[in-house]
Amino acid sequence: MNNTEFHELVDEKLQLLEDMIDDSGADIEPVITGNVLTLEFENRSQIVINKQEPMHEIWLASKSGGFHFSYVDEKWTCSKTGMEFIEMVKEECQKHADEEIEWV
């Protein structure tokens, strides 16, 4: 994969994530600054999602720690847990929000 393809794939996934957050009605504020998407919660906690172009990875930092996702078999998979990116973000959002989030 080249850098252009990497950015297209990540941007598509991050847009999906933003749409899911909007549709959930959860009090999560997505803020994009450069290659970083920060999910800000009412309790002031954050999840930071970062595009790592040199490694063609997505990095996620949350209360649970740091996680790296590589594009394998047409999905972003965590090297530490084997979880798919969106599933892990949903799980981490629930931990940060301290409440059940109804994902659509």
From Swiss-Prot:
Which SMART domains would you find in this protein's record? Answer: Frataxin_Cyay
What are the UniProt keywords, alphabetically? Iron, Metal-binding
PROSITE patterns, sorted: FRATAXIN_1 (PS01344), FRATAXIN_2 (PS50810)
Q: What cellular-component terms does GO give this entry?
A: cytosol
Q: Cross-referenced Pfam families, in alphabetical order?
A: Frataxin_Cyay
GO MF, one annotated term: ferric iron binding
Keyword Metal-binding among record annotations: yes
* Any GO BP: iron-sulfur cluster assembly
Tell me the PANTHER family matching this sequence.
FRATAXIN (PTHR16821), FRATAXIN, MITOCHONDRIAL (PTHR16821:SF2)
Per the similarity annotation, which family is this? Belongs to the frataxin family.
- The protein depicted here goes by the name Iron-sulfur cluster assembly protein CyaY
Q: Which gene encodes it?
A: cyaY
